[in-house]
């Protein structure tokens, strides 16, 4: 196992492995908000997100969704296929919440009849601005065909995840996806899917089971992430 660091983000580190085209992802215990302006560490968070992501990516693979995920190799680590990350954050929204409530002047909790798919330019220096297809083409982030592939994949992932979270008695409010190109140019789902990247509300109590408990100081982050993992394990057993 090599310790050559390839990339370090807010919540993960990527390392080279002895196998070409395969990277080792190490999940960190750090939690950030406001694009990294606020930062704290929570013991066990990395382990929780690693396990949750591994279970969800495996579930998506069974549903025919291709991703970079290979397998978990420890409590906090997993192996992934090396991809070139497309600098787009793809946000799928099923219920009004967060920035969308402010932008549209709507109340949080209002259901959206048909899921909204949004693109954000993945650039910390610009605070990840909301962009449209024309911006994507102008910035040469992706082609028209690639955007179609990404948008279709995002909607398919949403359909599959809603079934899963409904079984967990959780409403999938919205979530962020990232995609990458493999060595052959195929577009694969990448990054992670966890309470760091999703808004999750308990269907009955409306309790927030995601990073909003940290953003808004309304609960214990590791407690709610543990609750999500436990429910996920229950429905997959």
Curated annotation (Swiss-Prot):
GO terms of biological process kind: 'de novo' IMP biosynthetic process; cobalamin biosynthetic process
GO MF term set: ATP binding; phosphoribosylaminoimidazolesuccinocarboxamide synthase activity
Family matches, as Gene3D superfamilies: ATP-grasp fold, B domain, Phosphorylase Kinase, domain 1
Keywords: ATP-binding, Ligase, Nucleotide-binding, Purine biosynthesis
Lineage top rank: taxon: Bacteria
Pathway: Purine metabolism; IMP biosynthesis via de novo pathway; 5-amino-1-(5-phospho-D-ribosyl)imidazole-4-carboxamide from 5-amino-1-(5-phospho-D-ribosyl)imidazole-4-carboxylate: step 1/2
Enzyme class: ligase
InterPro entries: SAICAR_synt/ADE2_N, SAICAR_synt_PurC, SAICAR_synth, SAICAR_synthetase, SAICAR_synthetase_CS
Substrates-to-products reaction catalysed: 5-amino-1-(5-phospho-D-ribosyl)imidazole-4-carboxylate + L-aspartate + ATP = (2S)-2-[5-amino-1-(5-phospho-beta-D-ribosyl)imidazole-4-carboxamido]succinate + ADP + phosphate + 2 H(+)
EC number: 6.3.2.6
Family under the similarity heading: Belongs to the SAICAR synthetase family.
Protein name: Phosphoribosylaminoimidazole-succinocarboxamide synthase
Organism of this sequence: Listeria welshimeri serovar 6b (strain ATCC 35897 / DSM 20650 / CCUG 15529 / CIP 8149 / NCTC 11857 / SLCC 5334 / V8)
Gene field: purC
